[in-house]
Amino acid sequence: MPGELGSRTGQMTDLIYAEKDLVQSLKEYIRAEENKLSQIKSWAEKMDVLTSKSTSDPEGYLAHPVNAYKLVKRLNTDWLELENLVLQDTTNGFIANLTIQRQFFPTEEDETGAAKALMRLQDTYKLDAETLSRGNLPGTKYRSTLTVGDCFGMGRTAYNDGDYYHTVLWMEQALKQHDEGEDAAVSKVEILDYLSYAVFQFGDLHRAMELTRRLISLDSTHERAGSNLRYFEKLLEKEREEEGKEKSVNNTGTTTEAVVQSGAYERPLDYLPERDIYEALCRGEGVKMTPRRQKRLFCRYHDGNKNPHLLIAPFKEEDEWDSPHIVRYYDVMSDEEIEKIKELAKPRLARATVRDPKTGVLTVASYRVSKSSWLEEDDDPVVAKVNQRMQQITGLTVKTAELLQVANYGMGGQYEPHFDFSRKDEPDAFKRLGTGNRVATFLNYMSDVEAGGATVFPDFGAAIWPKKGTAVFWYNLYRSGEGDYRTRHAACPVLVGCKWDLDKVSEATHRLEEEVAEPGTHPTFWRR
């Protein structure tokens, strides 16, 4: 689906090698055409250095979100410009290879999606444009920077989406780097054109005029800028007429110049009421882990209520939260099992969907950005083995559970606050599964994440960080069958790295007392 490439690390890795192949093809073309333009040769050398670094450790390279964005941008925009240049002096070999590879290239929508992912990281983790542009991110192996053109591309993406907040941030960064002397194909005039209009959209008329005047000083023939400036001047004159005077009068009768706050623009509110709480938890802020609560959390060995399979080798169990009770189990999956699960899942990965509460139809949504696939026990013995292990740990039957769901969160991958259970206003949400509502969630972490990617619960202020080989477990319903609305949770955007998890949601078609009525299967911590 367009716009989702950045959410899948495996597919992005393929692009690394595709780009490397193109570089080799380009070098062969240069050798065949010794009189080739020096501009193309320079491009090839630059790409050769870049792809040599990226192919030496593709996953590590793509762990840096700036690298991932620039890869998509290069393949969608920069290589197209090069193709046009080469076509001026056509050589069949290189063009044929490029044409073949282009069918696998990112699209305009993919580049837009990658840019929006960077903006999502920028907002969630309170990173200014300067930090992202300079590549100063925690846990990164490769330092990668954004050029003036890259920053301009980010700003233009935001502008085309009607997002003037990010337009201002990124056009300002592009202008700053341009003013510092960085070489750029994009001109200051182009940057100022976008920036002045975006600033005007925030109602900052004085700064819009200032930026427009600067644009005109660089290009006095710019018709739109001249027209805009005249329009701004008329608006300002109208404002002054309505006020009756240029200066505001205070209560003492003295006059003061009206204060204009330039450049301080607030991020617009959106559809998510708990946005601030959710994003703060993603940053590790506002976690309500008090000393009193900490004293109620313990570690123990868990044998599944004396399950014969676990008596000899019980699992290490750690309380993550007291109410609702959330626990973490250690060494649930081995590295070999994790790699096998990922191997089975990768060919089937597709954009994760959500159920539209109004229509009941599965659809993609901007608040869930990841790739997922579903595994059955018949797919491989390891699936049945992992399934059985989760049943032994939780005491919940696998027969009334969804298939194993593997999720891959790449650059900016996230799942905003949501419930795992069906609410009363959507009683048929799980009808297609032939089971019932989702009793509990067993979430296996199949990777460590260098930065970001926490599982957070905005209602009670908990944040749980991924640890490879561990799993967290909680109940979504009370024993009465009523949903526990406190369990609304989210998968925070991945800032640096790649996140893999394996999700198992147990379901019930009847009252939960019957679901766990079999002796020895009732989890000890389930509370009404």
Regions found by a protein language model. Give the residues of each.
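Fe(II)/2-oxoglutarate oxygenase catalytic core
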Residues: 1-473, 477-528
